[in-house]
């Protein structure tokens, strides 16, 4: 649906900064929502060049933007240019949403909350008391791991090709949140045992994303799923990745990451 946008002197300014920015669908979603709900705001995509994040934030503050989102590659860098961040954002080490509260810029991370809401809605379970395996150790993995830990999972295992990055997340979860956390190299023979032992598996890697649809974050011998396990893939294109197909065929409940967008 095309957004019917009317701008006047009372229109609130909201936007998103990043580089590149042409790919973002956020303006279409937010402006359509504004129009449909008769809210008086406009959402603007803004390209910010490398080295200009501080100047951009200063300008958004001066222009009295109600708030703004941050996309790649500035979710980490923006932190040093705002006034406060939430505890969850501090642990994740990234901010994707900033609210202007009377001139005070407060940073939040809603990526993890979007994942948790989508997971619970699609798969019908929470994380408390669950054993979880997370595939990958990038920014998305860290955000999801922190969220799952904050919701009192029993144990989290990070599976990644680079052990050092996985170890960093595991150490964070143990030190800051007191959650039993481990890590394992994705090439290790112990991966199969981890997959068999957990209640929930979350893929945060790009393995299997279009156009590389024949790829899978787990080798065939490690796709040893059990009926009733929950398998969530943050990828949503294709709708069913090779990982999800293998899990579904073994009797798991599965979901892609499309719900994280809403």
Task: Describe the function of each predicted region.
Residues 151-177:
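NAD(P)-binding Rossmann-fold cofactor-contacting core
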Residues 117, 121, 236-237, 252-262:
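Active-site capping/gating segments
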Residues 2-123, 262:
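Phosphate/diphosphate ligand-binding glycine-rich loop within oxidoreductases
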Residues 7-8, 127-128, 152, 218-228:
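Short, conserved loop/helix-junction motifs that constitute active-site signature segments
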